[in-house]
């Protein structure tokens, strides 16, 4: 009997120890992820009871917080909501967070590691914690132009500062109003969410970062760079037939314009965007060299972690016909 009691006691002790280890591990190592989990009701209630930081374009807030007499002390408000929705995302009590509202949540709630001093100061002074603001790289005029240009159309516009990679504009159409998801009223928010999800035009999808499209002739820059890295020169002569039957197929590759002869320089082929010339150059280089150059340009990588993004791609195991099409930004390049 004593042996059985000792065995049960040992088992109970081990189970208690395992529980303590799990709780300690959760507290020490999973604190950040638990605090940032939008499904954590305790943290979520605390967030909605404090003054969240602004998201700024220049000095102008595009997402801010106002006092509220509703369920919580503060209400999230979006200015020009649909125009900036692909950047700010939404901040919803019932449906979580997206885009900058998600990736910069720690800064916006004042819980980031860099804000430890302000938290201590606030505690000592008895003030409630407040979130910190974030300033985007968006240029207001560029964003206006992008948004206005997309009116009535389906698509996306992104403008970059090529010297730094800074995003100057990011617009997606059709869009949505994040104010509808920021409401504290469950019925209103649920109705808005269901309508957005059911909309066949997918307004919740950020076409600038979450959708991938064939790059088309812009990819010829990648093929040209691969050529220059592998023995070609700007004045190298390349074949540029008016029509070219793709290897192993009956499919012709044609040109949108007259390339200027059956053989032209690589520089001229790029200048006039000659399809057959770059298709042939791509096949002569081989898919490994084209793919390597594409990866140097960022293909296969998520290039912007501040908003939810998907990686671009250059396909594998290509036939020569597929490689020719890929070398001009078609086939499965996206």
Residue ranges and their predicted role:
Residues 168-217, 222-334:
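Beta-lactam-recognizing serine transpeptidase/beta-lactamase-like catalytic domain environment
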């Amino acid at each position: 009997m004593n042996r059985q009691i000792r065995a049960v006691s040992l088992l109970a002790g081990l189970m208690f120890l395992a529980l303590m280890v799990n709780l300690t591990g959760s507290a020490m190592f999973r604190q950040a992820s638990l605090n940032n989990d939008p499904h954590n009701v305790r943290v979520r209630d605390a967030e909605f009871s404090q003054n969240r930081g602004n998201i700024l374009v220049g000095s102008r807030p595009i997402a801010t917080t106002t006092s509220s007499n509703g369920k919580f002390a503060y209400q999230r408000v979006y200015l020009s909501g649909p125009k900036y929705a692909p950047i700010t995302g939404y901040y919803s009590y019932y449906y979580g967070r997206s885009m900058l509202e998600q990736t910069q949540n720690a800064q916006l709630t004042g819980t980031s590691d860099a804000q430890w001093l302000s938290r201590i100061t606030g505690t000592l002074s008895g003030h409630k914690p407040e979130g910190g603001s974030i300033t985007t790289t968006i240029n207001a005029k560029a964003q206006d132009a992008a948004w206005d240009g997309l009116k009535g159309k389906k698509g996306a516009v992104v403008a970059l500062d090529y010297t730094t990679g800074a995003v100057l504009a990011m617009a997606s159409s059709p869009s949505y109003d994040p104010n509808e998801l920021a409401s504290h009223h469950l019925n209103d928010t649920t109705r808005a969410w269901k309508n957005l999800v059911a909309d066949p035009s997918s307004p919740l999808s950020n076409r600038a970062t979450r959708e991938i499209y064939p790059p088309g002739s812009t990819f010829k820059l990648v093929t040209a760079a691969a050529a220059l890295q592998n023995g070609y020169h700007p004045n190298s002569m390349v074949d540029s037939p008016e029509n070219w039957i793709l290897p192993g197929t009956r499919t012709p590759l044609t040109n949108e314009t007259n390339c200027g002869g059956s053989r032209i320089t690589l520089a001229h082929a790029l200048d006039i965007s000659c399809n057959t010339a770059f298709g042939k150059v791509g096949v002569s280089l081989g898919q490994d060299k084209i793919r390597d150059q594409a990866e140097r340009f960022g293909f296969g990588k998520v290039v912007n972690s501040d908003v939810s993004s998907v990686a671009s791609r250059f396909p594998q195991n290509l036939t020569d016909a597929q490689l020719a099409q890929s070398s001009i930004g078609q086939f499965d390049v996206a």
